[in-house]
Design a protein with these regions (language model features):
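Short Pro/Gly-enriched beta-strand edge/turn motifs at strand-loop
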Residues: 32-37, 115-125, 189, 253-256, ...
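Short acidic, Gly/Pro-enriched loop/turn segments at secondary-structure junctions
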Residues: 148-150, 282-285
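Signature of the N-terminal lobe/flap region of pepsin-like aspartyl proteases
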Residues: 44-159, 163-176
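Glycine-rich flap/beta-hairpin and adjacent strands of clan AA aspartyl proteases
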Residues: 125-135, 139-266, 361, 369-428
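N-terminal leader/early-domain signal
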Residues: 10-21, 25-37, 82-91, 99
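Aspartic protease catalytic domain
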Residues: 2-12, 17-29, 41-47, 55-59, ...
Length: 441
């Protein structure tokens, strides 16, 4: 089996081709937005973060789950899909290359205009499984921002996405959710990268996930400022750590059966240590480093509701957290999926959440760290019981730390792909605001 790495030169050639493909969009727009936005809300049943776009002709509203490490947008086209502007990507076209095609439809009939004939496919996935998807493009609309208020709607006539070849890929998503919107790094057709290429703004986006299942948070795509309230730009408080880029092996079946090395769309960062109430924990440093097989290290994921820790790391964090809890707060039996739980009768509560030990996630040096406070470290599971909102990793292999959605709630997190860095704001509660306090509804 042959191995072919994707060079950075080829990657940027793909981006250049993409600019040519989307040039018609600019001629049809009367404005050049600098920032776009999506509203996003936590689904109470799946704990996934759900947003909505409008796609197709005529336009149809589609609920989609947020996938930080996803390569692209995918939408279920199996049930009731109708669009006069849907265009499948033809084999060996620029769209196929951009969307990292892994195979191409074979023609067994004379009619080569059939969508399933001469169309290319890639891999699409949900948090549990994956399948193949037909690469295509169609009309998509998204709201722009004018300062701290909504601006005009941006219309993209040929946004690249994928249609899974089976309808069961939505089974692990929330009710009426029709797909996933991928914001993965290094992917030429990720949601943010396509808009940056089309409207010629910086490749960056920021998420502000609300802790409420009834009120929306917001996803910003494009330039800051990121106004969470009328007078507060949350991007001013960011501390940055580099994004780690990684490669992975992918099997391609067309035009030849080969294995290629492609960039991973996942977001990896280097965590050097963890402190609880200022005390550095004795973690295995080897586990904190990402290896060539994407094992170890730290990944950021919205597909994980609560931060997952490798078992030995979980034990150390849990014991240290228990030791630093107020003495009057007693342990109680575990409540799945959590192992470390407490009686909440005597724990204090402030605007920062529960009176819990402060957790510092330390990045490239001791002075650069992200602080997790009580509102993000403890979760109420039932009346009178709260639990440490971290879980032990079940799989034998994987990341040492996977930062989950609960820990990101009411924090602004910026993904600056142009500068290869991620910015963390710390809890917006310090600023007496929260992610639901925006003015974009």
């Amino acid at each position: 089996m042959k191995l072919f790495p994707m060079s950075s030169t080829k990657y940027y050639i793909f981006l250049f081709n993409f600019l040519l493909i989307t040039s018609t969009t600019l001629s049809k727009s009367n404005f050049q937005p600098k920032t776009l936005f999506l509203l996003v809300k936590k689904d109470p049943s799946t704990l996934q973060y759900i947003t909505q776009i409008h796609q197709r002709t005529p336009l149809v509203p589609l609920k989609l789950a947020l996938n930080l490490g996803g390569e692209s947008l995918w939408v279920d086209c199996q049930k009731g899909h109708k669009s006069s502007t849907y265009k499948p990507a033809r084999c060996e076209s620029a769209q196929c290359d951009l969307a990292w095609s892994t195979s191409c439809g074979n023609c067994y009939e004379n009619n080569t205009s059939l969508p399933i004939c001469n169309s290319c496919y890639n891999v699409v996935s949900n948090p549990v499984t994956s399948t193949t998807g037909e690469i295509a493009d169609d009309v998509l609309t998204i709201q722009s921002i004018n300062g701290s208020i909504p601006g005009p709607v941006a219309i993209v006539p040929n946004f690249i996405f994928s249609c899974p070849t089976t309808s069961n890929l939505t089974q692990n998503l929330g009710k009426n959710v029709k797909g996933m919107v991928g914001f993965g790094q290094q992917s030429p057709v990720s949601f943010a990268t396509q808009f940056a290429s089309i409207f010629k703004f910086s490749r960056q986006f920021a998420i502000c996930l609300s802790s409420s299942t009834k009120r929306n948070g917001v996803i910003f795509i494009g330039h800051s400022p990121y106004f969470i309230s009328l007078a507060f730009d949350a991007s001013r408080d960011l501390i940055y750590t580099p994004i780690i880029t990684q490669q992975r092996f992918v099997t391609i079946t067309y035009p030849h059966y080969i294995s290629v090395i492609r960039p991973s769309p996942e977001y990896y960062i280097q965590v050097t240590s963890v402190r609880i109430n200022g005390k550095t924990l004795p973690l295995n440093k080897t586990l904190l480093s990402l290896d060539e097989n994407e094992e170890g290290g730290t990944r950021i994921s919205t597909n994980v509701p609560y931060t997952e820790l490798e078992p030995s790391i979980y034990d150390i964090v849990s014991k240290a957290f228990i030791n630093e809890m107020p003495k009057e707060v007693k342990k109680v039996p575990s409540v799945q999926p959590f192992k470390t739980c407490f009686d909440s009768t005597y724990i204090g509560v402030s605007r920062l959440g529960y009176d819990a030990p402060e957790i510092n996630i330390v990045f490239q040096k001791q002075s650069v760290y992200w602080t997790i406070i009580g509102s993000n470290s403890l979760v109420k599971v039932k009346e009178g019981v709260i639990c440490l909102a971290f879980v032990e990793r079940k799989e034998a292999t994987g990341q040492a730390i996977v930062v989950g959605g609960y820990q990101m709630q009411d924090n602004l997190i910026e993904f600056d792909l142009s500068r290869r860095r991620i910015g963390f704001s710390n809890s917006l509660f310090y600023r007496q605001t929260m992610c639901a306090n925006h003015n974009y509804a």
